[in-house]
Regions:
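Nucleotide-state sensing region of NTPase/ATPase domains
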Residues: 54-145, 150-151
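Conserved small/polar residues in nucleotide/adenosyl-binding loops
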Residues: 157-159
Length: 159
C-alpha cells in the first residue's frame, strides 16, 4: 500500500524568463527551505513559480503572459526535480514564445519530459497548499467556510 501522505520534496528548481528571473537554478537540501533576501529580490516570485507546478493560475492568479520576464521573448518555463509518493520525477510547465508552433497562451505541462494533458497530473508527484494574506476571511469568516476549506485539503491528501 502506498502512503498518500508521503512528504513531497523539491530537490532542484529551475526558472527561465519567469518574472525577474532570466535564468535561475537552485538545488535544495533537507526538508525545510527558507528564502531570505531584501524586498524585491524575488522571494515571492520563486514561490509563485513553484505554485505553477499545480493546477490553476498560480499563487497570484496571474495570466500566463504576465509572468514572463519583460526582457525575454514572451516565453517562460518552470521545472522542478521532485520526490514524492511515486518517487523521483521532473515536472515542468510554461508557455512558448509568440509565433512558435503553439499559441503563446497555451500552457504546456510535462512530467519526465513527456507531455501531460494538464497540470492536474502534477498532483500525483507534488502536493501543495498555500495561504495568503488575502485569504484572511478563511479565518475571520464563518466556521462553515473553514470546514469546507479543510475538508477539501484533507480530501486531496487522500486521493
Amino acid at each position: 500500500m502506498t502512503n498518500s501522505m508521503t512528504a513531497s520534496r523539491i530537490h532542484r528548481l529551475t526558472l527561465t524568463h519567469f518574472r525577474n528571473y532570466r535564468a535561475a537554478s537552485v538545488t535544495t537540501r533537507g526538508d525545510v527551505i527558507v528564502l531570505v533576501g531584501p524586498n524585491g529580490a524575488g522571494k515571492t516570485n520563486a514561490i509563485e513559480a513553484i505554485s505553477f507546478l499545480s493546477p490553476g493560475r498560480g499563487l497570484r492568479r496571474a495570466t500566463l503572459d504576465d509572468v514572463a520576464d519583460n526582457q525575454g521573448d514572451g516565453s517562460w518555463a518552470v521545472s522542478a526535480e521532485v520526490e514524492g509518493a511515486l518517487g523521483l520525477a521532473t515536472l515542468g510547465t510554461g508557455i512558448d514564445a509568440p509565433g512558435s508552433e503553439a499559441p503563446a497562451t497555451s500552457r504546456r505541462c510535462r512530467i519526465d519530459r513527456e507531455p501531460v494533458t494538464s497540470a492536474a497530473a502534477f498532483g500525483d508527484h507534488l502536493r501543495m497548499v498555500w495561504l495568503t494574506p488575502t485569504m484572511d476571511g478563511l479565518f475571520l469568516g464563518a466556521a462553515s467556510e473553514r470546514r469546507r476549506f479543510f475538508d477539501r485539503q484533507i480530501g486531496r491528501a487522500h486521493v
